[in-house]
Swiss-Prot record:
Protein name as it appears in the record: Uncharacterized protein HI_1466
Main location group: membrane
Organism: Haemophilus influenzae (strain ATCC 51907 / DSM 11121 / KW20 / Rd)
PROSITE patterns: TONB_DEPENDENT_REC_3
Domain TBDR plug, chain residue ranges per copy: 62-167
Source organism, top-level taxon: Bacteria
Amino acid sequence: MNFKLSLVYTALFAGISVSALAETRHKANTETIEQINVQDTGIKQNGYQTTGTSVVSKAEVPVFDTPNTVNILSTKLLEDRKPESLIDALYNVSGVSQANTLGGMFDAIQKRGFGRNRDNSIMRNGLQAGPAKNFSATTETVEVLKGPASVLYGIQDPGGVELISLLKNHNKRHVMSLVEP
């Protein structure tokens, strides 16, 4: 009986000593690294509600602190509604209606009663878009800046400006091949 107990005690102490040795070796190999804080200042989307900073005001100002009227259509909203044109996307934005599109050839939007079919108030990624269909499957968000603050983008009607942000291209090339045995 004493032999069995001594055998159990020996195995127990051997196991404890091996784990203690492994723990001391692990502590010797660890390094302390400096903490890095990452802060996101872009548009934060929580479903249909967007918070964060808006691109349309050309400043890193939170949407709630912007003294202008800014409406942002989030990616989630555009995915769920699946609009076919810019006027379909802007259907629920107040003060925005369709202008003369010359039979649906291009986008034309009236903002607060101002605007016509060629008023250059539609921007794609911050640049004036031509008289064409500007809404496509690559549209990520649509922002509407209403009122006289639209002069931030040049000579504009005081009704406002629409900024269409396209999906970001990360310059990754994808190669697909088919190999048959």
